Swiss-Prot record:
Binding residue positions for substrate: 124, 154-155, 186, 192, 262-265, 356
GO biological process, one term: glucose catabolic process
Domain of life: Bacteria
Keyword terms, alphabetized: Glycolysis, Isomerase, Manganese, Metal-binding
UniProt source species: Chloroflexus aggregans (strain MD-66 / DSM 9485)
Gene3D superfamilies named among the record's database cross-references: Alkaline Phosphatase, subunit A, BPG-independent phosphoglycerate mutase, domain B
Family named by the database record: Belongs to the BPG-independent phosphoglycerate mutase family.
Gene giving rise to this polypeptide: gpmI
Binding site for Mn(2+) 1: 423, 427, 483
Active site positions: 63
Range of residues in the leader sequence: none
The protein, known as: 2,3-bisphosphoglycerate-independent phosphoglycerate mutase
Pathway: Carbohydrate degradation; glycolysis; pyruvate from D-glyceraldehyde 3-phosphate: step 3/5
Length: 540
């Protein structure tokens, strides 16, 4: 059987699969062509949310993550999920950066410090990761382990730290390792706006033992609440013993593990520890601020001294060039689908209207801006309306025309198109408009698919996440405007040799399986890092 050409990936953005009902606009729409293909062609559904796309369990999918997974051909884990998965798998406890920090403190007979945002917020850090580090220290028999808790109050309730402290104290008691040495509101310890005077107060508590004083973390938090200060704004506080001496400070020869996985609010404090040119950098910053006529702080903070022989580990890469160990370095999508096609000398065409153009280019290509050799692109402007329920067809007719030109040019081996309508109109919450949006997509495919089949090509039709199939909120009965956790449809339309009598699409797939499926149709071998599996099962 000759290789199909072109192989076309059609992404019906936001068209999920759900039972019929008054809120399922995709089902309510008059879409005879899509309905027929779903019924008569090889069909399956794909996991497009939660763990299937590298998000936390139960989290709705989105277009950025969806297209990243589609193009990568493997599950692209977001940092929270990646670290939590490493804990579950056990890989966390053999992480080279963590083990190097532990070896450092053993060789220097020094202390291990764990610092980061405290609690289950999951935006910048997660308490499970801190608990796992305590477990690691216990397994490795590290005796001196000190905790520096940055209180949240933003990604969680403003005064919730005491509850998280109960949990942490239970872990410490169970493992017999860990002593809380400082607490500080994230306002100080996690500033990202070059307000160095805030960072300086946190650093002074951590390194010099200078700040508010309390006999325990609980006492520090309760004292703040008594002064009507919520978690975020708790002044950097040093925990002291019965003699008024700090329980611990970070010293020369120690090791620090910064538990934040989101980079932006970890950079500044990390620089305070490891940047040899910090004071000059701060001075230049305030000189620029002064030249721009901006107000300066009453006192410009300068680091008294930089710690020596410090082993500093960040959970993820906060910034290129920092002299730190990175526990979970960025995992780049080195050979996305478009790269494999390009390396084979094939031509490809990526098209969408403005709203979804970055998704079929930047995100599908693994975060790469530039096209690969042999990759052509076409951007169709989205209509300029206040909200897309006013024009539910959006630019689908124009996308279809340009797509037909690409197909009939016979230049391309692979084509990808995104129809934005079900998602973008779905966000308006208007069921009549979303019905029209789905009908506009059906009308476009009614013209496109025959042109593909006439040339001996095939079309793989999918969605990247759900939306249009759930327009009524099950809790409130009001409009539902968000994405869903419903699966995405996936069906293959082709000529002889591609019907249900010849092949089927396996169940249990996810978006990461799309690229290997397309490469099988293109008769190309997936690269080693493309761990997704083709959905095609050939009937014997």
């Amino acid at each position: 059987m000759t290789r199909p050409r072109p192989v076309v990936l059609i992404i019906m953005d936001g068209w999920g699969v759900a039972p019929p009902g008054p809120g399922n606009a995709a089902d309510l729409a008059d879409t005879p062509h899509v309905d027929e293909w779903m019924a008569t062609c090889p069909f399956t559904t794909l996991g497009a949310s939660g763990l299937d796309v590298g998000l936390p369990e139960g989290q709705i999918g989105n277009s950025e993550v969806g297209h990243l997974n589609i193009g990568a051909g493997f599950i692209v884990y977001q940092e929270l999920t990646r670290i939590s998965k490493a804990i579950a798998d056990g890989d966390f406890f053999t992480n080279p950066a963590f083990l190097q920090a532990i070896e450092h403190v053993k060789q220097h007979n020094s202390a291990l410090h764990l610092m980061g945002l405290f609690g289950p917020g999951g935006v910048h850090a997660h308490e499970d990761h801190l608990h796992a580090l305590l477990e690691l220290a216990h397994r490795q028999q590290v005796r001196r382990v000190y905790l520096h808790l940055f209180l949240d109050g933003r990604d969680v309730l403003p005064r919730s730290a005491l509850g998280f402290l109960d949990t942490l104290e239970g872990v410490i008691a169970r493992l017999g390792v860990g002593v809380i040495a400082t607490v500080s509101g994230r306002y100080y310890a996690m500033d990202r706006d070059k307000r160095w005077e805030r960072t300086g107060r946190a650093y002074a508590a951590l390194v010099d033992g200078i700040g508010e004083r309390a006999t325990s973390a609980r006492a520090a938090i309760e004292a703040a609440y008594a002064n009507d200060i919520s978690d975020e704004f708790v002044l950097p506080t040093v925990i002291v013993d019965a003699h008024g001496t700090p329980v611990a400070t970070v010293r020369d020869g120690d090791a620090v593990i910064f538990t934040n996985f989101r980079p932006d609010r970890g950079r500044q404090l990390t620089r305070a520890f490891v940047d040899p040119d910090l004071n000059e950098r701060i001075r230049q910053h305030y000189e620029r601020q002064k030249a721009e006529g901006q107000p300066l702080p009453p006192q410009i903070w300068q680091r008294d001294r930089q710690l020596h022989d410090l082993c500093f580990v960040t959970m993820t890469q906060y910034e290129e060039g920092l002299p730190v160990l990175v526990a979970f370095p960025p995992r780049y999508v080195t050979t996305p689908l478009a790269a494999v096609i390009s390396q084979a000398g094939m031509r490809q065409f990526h098209i969408a209207e403005t709203e979804k153009y970055p998704h079929v280019t930047f995100f599908l290509n693994g975060g790469r801006e530039e096209p690969f050799p042999g990759e052509d692109r076409r951007l169709i402007p989205s209509p300029k309306v206040a909200t897309y329920d006013l024009k539910p067809e959006m630019s689908a007719p124009e996308v279809t025309e340009a797509l037909l030109q690409a197909i009939t040019s016979d230049q391309y081996d692979f084509i990808v198109v995104n129809y934005a309508n079900p998602d973008m109109v779905g966000h308006t919450g208007s069921i009549p408009a979303v019905i029209k949006a789905c009908e506009a997509v059906d009308a476009g495919l009614a013209r496109v698919v025959p042109a593909i089949l006439e040339r001996g090509g095939v079309a793989l039709v999918i969605a990247d996440h759900g939306n249009a199939e759930q327009m009524i909120d099950p809790e409130t009965g009001g409009p539902h405007t968000a994405h869903t956790t419903n699966p995405a449809p996936c069906f293959l339309i082709g000529g002889p040799g591609y019907g249900k009598d010849t092949i089927r699409l396996r169940s249990g797939g996810r978006l990461a399986d799309v690229a290997p499926t397309l490469l099988e149709l293109l008769e190309l071998t997936p690269p080693a890092d493309m761990t997704g599996q083709s959905l095609i099962v050939r009937n014997l």
